[in-house]
């Protein structure tokens, strides 16, 4: 995340960006708080803010700690983020959506926190790059690629929560 934070146009928004609460917080703790926006549990609002950052020419990294939570923003994701270039006449801006398939180790959080909706999101969003980070060695390169895309296609990067405990 430090690599992404070095870019003057990036901002991190979501739950547990400024205050601890998820495993993802530890990946953001060394990033200056001026680059982070802590949000309440309001996923659709968060996606709307993500779009607002894009309209302002910024590259938001919008963090949804669990894939299941991202579902609450599906309207904005499918109807606005996926159609962003068409709706804005080709505005050159992109977002990075960071989410995770919830960990089951050391404690299983139950079915509402461990969903993998990769295939479904790919079928709904034809203009968003959807990447499952199933190998820890791919993680940095995929984030770097998402940030540096010249075509300004937004990317959803799907992490595995258990990697925080085992890799």
Language model regions located:
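Thiamine diphosphate
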Residues: 1-166
């Amino acid at each position: 995340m430090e690599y992404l934070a070095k870019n003057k146009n990036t901002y991190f928004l979501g739950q547990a960006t400024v205050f601890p609460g998820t495993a993802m917080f530890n990946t953001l703790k060394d990033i200056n708080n001026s680059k982070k926006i802590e949000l309440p549990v309001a996923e659709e609002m968060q996606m709307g803010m993500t779009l607002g950052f894009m309209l302002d020419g910024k590259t938001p990294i919008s963090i949804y700690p669990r894939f299941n939570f991202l579902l609450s923003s599906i309207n904005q994701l499918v109807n606005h983020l996926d159609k962003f270039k068409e709706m804005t006449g080709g505005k050159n801006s992109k977002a990075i959506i960071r989410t995770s398939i919830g960990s089951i180790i050391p404690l299983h959080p139950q079915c509402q926190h461990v969903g993998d909706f990769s295939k479904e999101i790919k079928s709904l969003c034809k203009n968003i790059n959807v990447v499952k980070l199933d190998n820890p060695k791919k993680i940095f390169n995929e984030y770097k690629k998402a940030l540096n895309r010249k075509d300004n296609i937004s990317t959803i990067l799907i992490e595995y929560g258990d990697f925080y405990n085992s890799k």
